[in-house]
Amino acid sequence: MTTTLFTNVHIATGMPGSTAAETTPLQDILVEDGRFKKIGQRLVAKLATQGMDISSIETIDLEGKLACPPFCDTHLHLDYVFTARKPGAVNESGTLFEGIQRWSETKSDLTVDEVKERAKIGIAKEMRHGVQFIRSHADVTDPNLTSLKALLELKEELKDTVTLQIVSFPQEGMYSYEGPHGESGADLVEEGLKMGADCVGGIPHFEQCREFGERSMHTVVELASKYNKLIDVHCDETDDPNSRYLELLSALAYRAGIGSKTTASHTCSLGSADNAYFFHLSKLLKAAHINFACAPTENLYLQGRQDTFPKRRGITRVKELTEAGVNVSLGQDSMQDPWYPVGNGNMMLILDYVLHLAQMMSFEEIDDALKFLTVNGATTLGMRDSYGLEAGKPANFIVLDASSVFDAVYERCDVLRSVREGRTLFTRNTSITTDLDLLTL
C-alpha cells in the first residue's frame, strides 16, 4: 500500500466540502493507493492518536497554498497545433472561414506520427498549467482518418498521466464534404465512432445551406443515441444572430433524453441575439441540461471581422447562462494553428479573459470563478462522479501559488504541483532572488 500525506493546504472554494476563501482553514490530505482516504483539519494529530506511525508515511508540506481539482480544457484541437506557419496555412483575414479553407488545403500530407508529436507538445504545455482532462476534436473529413488515428493512439499511451476525450469532428461539414470515394462527412463521423471516438461532432453553421445544417443536427443526435456517445457540436460560431442551430440541437437532445451528455461549443451568435430570444431559449437550455464550452480568446479574435464599430466581443452569453443555471466550461481551442496564431494552454489566462469579456468581476463571481476550469469542466466531460477532492475518489489535484481563489485568479497564478492518482507529475519553484525589500512584498 502506497500512502502519502499532504499537509497545510487550503481547499479551493466552489468545490465539495469547501467554504469561503477567507475562512477556509488549513487542511491535510491523506492519499492511499491513488485515492483520497481522508481530508480534514489537524489530520496529522488525529491519525497519530489512531495509532498510525506518521514518521513512516511520506509527508509533503504544501505550505498554506491552495489545492483544487485539476483543470479541464473542454475544447481543443490537438491535431491542428503548431501548424500556423506551415506553407499555405497562414490565415490572412483572421476569420474562421479562411482558417477552415487553409486547413483543408494543407492537411493532405499529415501522418499519424507527425500529428502525435505535435499533439504531445500541446498536451505537455497544458499539463504544465495544471490541466489533466482534455477534450480534443479530431478532424475526420479525411478519408485516411489520420488525425483520429493519431489522437486515439495518444489517448491510450498517455492514459496514466492525462485523460483525453476525442470528438469525431467533421471540420468540412457532415453534408457539405464529399470524399474521393463519395463518402460524406457523416459517414466518416460514424466511422470515427466505431473506431473509438468518445463524442459525436458537428459544424452546422459551416454547411452549404440551412437544410444541411439542420439535417446534421438530427444525424448528430441519432448517432449519439445509436452508439451511446457524448455530443460536442461547433454550434453557431458566427456573428449572425439568425444562426439558431443551438435551439434545434437542444430540442433534439432534450427529446432523446441526452441533454446532459450534449455540449454546444462556441455559440457566438447567442451574443448577437436579442434578449427576447435568449429569454425564450434559456428555458429549453436549462430543462435539457445542455453544457456549453466557451473559447473566449479565440472567439474574441475570430469574430466581429465584418464589424466596423461598435465591434462585437464574439463570445457567448457566459454570464447570463451561468445565472440561468446552465453549465459553462472553457477551452483553449487552438495553439498556433490556421485559426489562432498564439495559445499556450494556460487555462488561468483563458479564465481571466472570460471574466473580463463577460463582465463577471464582482467579488462573489471572482471567488467562485475556478468552477469554470474545474467542476464545470468535469460536468461537461461527464466525469463528475470520479472528480473532486473527496474521500474515495481518485487523488487528482493541483496546488496553486496562492492561498485563496481570489488571489489565484487576480494573480493568474502558477501551478506549483500536479498530482495524479497520488503521484506527483511535476513541481514548480516560483521564488525570486533579490536584495530589495520592496520586491519581497
PLM ranges: what are they?
Residues 1-54, 405:
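N-terminal metal-binding scaffold of metallo-dependent hydrolase/deaminase domains
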Residues 82-115, 245-263, 288-291, 296-299, ...:
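Active-site gating loops and adjacent loop-to-helix segments of metal-dependent hydrolytic enzymes
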Residues 230, 251-262, 298-302, 312-400:
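His/Asp/Glu-enriched, well-ordered alpha-helical/loop segment
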Residues 391-441:
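C-terminal cap of metal-dependent C-N hydrolases
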